[in-house]
Amino acid sequence: MTKYSLALRFKTLMSSLLLASSMVVAGSVSADDPLKIGFVHVSPIGDAGWTYQHDLGRKAIEEKFGDKIQVKYIESVPEGAEAERVIRDLASSGNKLIFGTSFGFMNPMVKVAKAFPDTYFEHATGYKTEANMGNYNARFYEGRYLSGIVAGSMTKSNTLGYVAAFPIPEVVMGINAYIRGAQSVNPKAEVKVVWINAWFDPGREREATVALIDQGADIITHHTDSTAVVSAAEEKGKYSIGYNSDMSKYGPKYQLTAVTHHWEQFYIDQVQQALDKTWKPTAIWGGVKEGMIGLSALNAAVPKEVADKVEQAKADMIAGKLHPFAGPVLDQDGKERVAAGSNITDEDLSKMDYYVQGVQGKLPK
């Protein structure tokens, strides 16, 4: 073998080794690489509402962790097949922690989680877990009960209005807690419900609000994602109670308060665990005590004695002395659902499929 051919073979061997080395580096994740995080939302972020509150959580983790993380968020993703495609795309593109912030993302996320065992998934408002998928929720019903005290105290017609998205337990328990809070101070109060079968549809939310006002409701609240209910009530000169965010900029005169959601600390905790490699799938359900649910400032029209009742109920809730579904709880037909001296269990809450007394109409099945 000539010196030339030997040198050529050596050069070829070194080139191959360098190429292989570069491929290994390119295909691995350095400890210095940022943790890629994805958020999937069912509605636009906007400046108030369900998705807006979750986006405050995104901003909180970006401020907290800086260049240790890289975040991508996708808005207005329909529940179902499209959600599965979006979640799968996020996982395929290297996002190692993915949050899905709508109930209807649950089954699509389960499918994707099984296909990406090395990725962490978190689903909001659902009930399923996997080896690499947890779920998280807030005890919205606690805030509903407190806001019901306000509504029951302020109504003149004794008819409250409620614009609701879908007849799932999360929404139903909110309606029931709201009227129980109202009746704790005003036994004559009743609530009428209009279902719009959408999380975010400002047009239908507005139409439902007007319909409820036409039926005699003088205070309107909602379990939907936009500000349309508060805005429509303001235009009609009727009181409202916002949901998700403080919506007083859309109801400066007539919003009495709002049930507010606070996700920031939850997202910070999950990201920290992912960075520390201590993340585990859990089912988290925080409420007023944990700071995940609150009320915005009360309208100046709310008397001090009403504000005091709300504050006392909140303090009792935090102390474990007050549960919105402490027995006896009777459904519309008079059937006892929770016995006197007992509190409803989380399991029964999570499958609530009945209206309590004080709710007008029949629950869609």
Q: Residue ranges of each PLM-predicted region?
A:
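Intrinsically disordered, low-complexity repeat segments enriched in small/polar residues
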Residues: S5-L6, M14-S15, P324
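Bacterial N-terminal signal peptides
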Residues: K11-A26
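Glycine-centered signal
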Residues: A7, S28-V29
